[in-house]
Structures are given as C-alpha cells and as structure tokens.
C-alpha cells in the first residue's frame, strides 16, 4: 500500500487488488464539482474506473472515495515504485485540474453491440435526495460526462456506486441541490434528458 500526502488535505493511497486491477483511495475536502474533478483526474492519469464507492461525511465537509481501476497501458500488476509514481501523478493531475483539462484517451474502441439504456429516478423524501440509476453501455469518458451533467445543474453527489460488468455499466447516484432544496420535477426532467444525450452519444 502506497500512501501519499498523509498529513495534507488531499490523501491518495494506491495498492494492487488482483490481476491488473488497482484499488485507489482518495480522501479530500468536499467541494463543488469534486466528482467531476476526480473522474477527469483518474482518466488523465491513464486509468479506467471499473468500480467506485463515493461517500461524503455527515457534515459534507469531507469526501472519501474508493475506486477500482485498471491501467490502460498494460495488464500486469504494478511494482511498488510504479504505485508511488501513480499516486504522485494522481495528486499532480488533481491539483492542476482546470476547465481546460483534456480527457485522457485510452484508445478503447467504440462498442459494436449496445446494451439497453435505462435511467431511473426516485425520491427519498425523508433525506430530501434523489436516487438516479443509469444502466447503459460503457465507453471512454462516460463517467466524467455524467459527472459534468450533475455539475452543470448545480447538484451535489452525496454518495455514488459505480459498477462495470464487461461492456455494461450500472451507476447509482444520491443527489441533492447545492442549496439543499429538493430537486424540482422540471429540473429532474431536464437532467434526465441531458443524461440521455450523454449515454446515447455513441449509439
């Protein structure tokens, strides 16, 4: 296990999981657009996200994020030096992130067969949050494109669960407005339409 920036606001830990998969833990101060920033950072670092758990502290000041990812350049396990280099690269890309940051192209081919796309929404009235589940075909940059939709609509991601099974993804997000008010039906319809454009982009 390689841990960088133990005493700083940004903590990154990387370790080999199994085969060519890596487990990446990132603890950082919560901020607007954080999930978009993390997704773009990992893509720029040459990583493809396979699985993820995103959680915010109860006061929403801190975010603890665990990603399972694979490196696009090779299919072997990382050496300790490579894990250290990767951790430092993630920190560097995170700190240098900006709106002009380009998405890393991992060369993944467009899928020949498309999975059925489904976007469902439900409201947890007790917590005042919406739960959106997206099932669709995977493609490079999909997760950051989804995160961008949420960011552009001033939504905060309280928690998220990302699952990739072969060429299919099933992503669930617990969302709320930044102003803590319940997302209106009209706004949710707009968000779902934007998500449809994103997930159908490569169909």
Regions found by a protein language model. Give the residues of each.
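Regulatory modules associated with amino-acid/nitrogen control
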Residues: 1-203
